[in-house]
Amino acid sequence: MDGVLWRVRTAALMAALLALAAWALVWASPSVEAQSNPYQRGPNPTRSALTADGPFSVATYTVSRLSVSGFGGGVIYYPTGTSLTFGGIAMSPGYTADASSLAWLGRRLASHGFVVLVINTNSRFDYPDSRASQLSAALNYLRTSSPSAVRARLDANRLAVAGHSMGGGGTLRIAEQNPSLKAAVPLTPWHTDKTFNTSVPVLIVGAEADTVAPVSQHAIPFYQNLPSTTPKVYVELDNASHFAPNSNNAAISVYTISWMKLWVDNDTRYRQFLCNVNDPALSDFRTNNRHCQ
């Protein structure tokens, strides 16, 4: 009788343990999925969350032009209060502008999990190809000479670029020159060259009412002439001017963060904001859908 009772109790205990293990596996599966991508940062994204500052606190460091070579200094925005590492982004302002013109976007990107250096150029009148060289120098500074607190947060193997106007033209040029970059985001870009042979994934932001770099002469030809094998997206801001990137802009925030997250962090959670887009804030949207596959 005691043997029968022991076997019954043992069977009941085993069944309970198996049920508990199954429950634990189901409960843990989202975490397991998240851990499969070592670069995934932050909670599951929503569109509204991408229009505001993200989950990370942000520290800043001012880079004196006297302490660097190859570019004119600038401001670094980087996540703090964490031991994680993050991809790096160098950003160039436009013609006659300085780093303050993109301060909002630099901080926004950092708050969502990037180390961002918004540069000042050697001269406010530098043309796009000079800005490309300065973006390259800025990335090298981030990797090798930035403060230890910054380098402790930087994953130097995951780098990207962005820029406004002539800085956007410089962004296209450096993307052509440096195929190791993970992503490029030219904002209302300007360049006399319309063809850039790059394999770096490119998101181009145009502005419908741009009279400085009209989209028909700049942003759209840039997009059209990128190789068909290159992941590419063109978004056109409805009724926006050339200077839309210089102030807080919800659409720029959503698409820039999403593009950087997808390609710098390999975070496919952000595809939802870049595929099958129907956005009233845009007057045009184009893509070859290579990022949606």
Swiss-Prot record:
One of its GO terms (cellular component) is extracellular region. It was also shown that biologically recycled PET produced from enzymatically depolymerized PET waste exhibits the same properties as petrochemical PET, before being processed into bottles, thereby contributing towards the concept of a circular PET economy. InterPro entries: AB_hydrolase_fold (IPR029058), FrsA_esterase (IPR050261), PET_hydrolase/cutinase-like (IPR041127). It comes from Unknown prokaryotic organism. Optimum pH is 8.5 with pNP-butyrate as substrate. Shows 70% of the maximal activity at pH 7.0 and pH 9.5. It comes from the Bacteria. PANTHER family: DIENELACTONE HYDROLASE DOMAIN-CONTAINING PROTEIN-RELATED (PTHR22946), POLYKETIDE TRANSFERASE AF380 (PTHR22946:SF9). Pfam families: PETase. It is found in: Secreted. Poly(ethylene terephthalate) binds at residues 95, 166, 190. Is inhibited in vitro by diethyl pNP-phosphate (E600), but not by EDTA. GO terms for molecular function: acetylesterase activity; cutinase activity. The active site is at residues 165, 210, 242. Its main location: secreted. Catalyzes the hydrolysis of cutin, a polyester that forms the structure of plant cuticle. Shows esterase activity towards p-nitrophenol-linked aliphatic esters (pNP-aliphatic esters), with a preference for short-chain substrates (C4 substrate at most). Cannot hydrolyze olive oil. Is also able to degrade poly(ethylene terephthalate), the most abundant polyester plastic in the world. Can also depolymerize poly(epsilon-caprolactone) (PCL), a synthetic aliphatic biodegradable polyester. Residues 1-34 form the signal peptide. Keywords: Disulfide bond, Hydrolase, Secreted, Serine esterase, Signal. The keyword tRNA processing does not apply. The keyword Metal-binding does not apply. This is Leaf-branch compost cutinase. Optimum temperature is 50 degrees Celsius with pNP-butanoate as substrate. Optimum temperature using PET as substrate is superior to 70 degrees Celsius. Shows 70% of the maximal activity at 30 and 70 degrees Celsius with pNP-butyrate as substrate. Has half-lives of 5 hours at 50 degrees Celsius, 80 minutes at 60 degrees Celsius, 40 minutes at 70 degrees Celsius and 7 minutes at 80 degrees Celsius. Is thermostable, with a determined melting temperature (Tm) of 84.7 degrees Celsius. It catalyses: cutin + H2O = cutin monomers; (ethylene terephthalate)(n) + H2O = (ethylene terephthalate)(n-1) + 4-[(2-hydroxyethoxy)carbonyl]benzoate + H(+); 4-[(2-hydroxyethoxy)carbonyl]benzoate + H2O = terephthalate + ethylene glycol + H(+); an acetyl ester + H2O = an aliphatic alcohol + acetate + H(+). Its EC number is 3.1.1.74, 3.1.1.101. Disulfide bonds join 275-292.
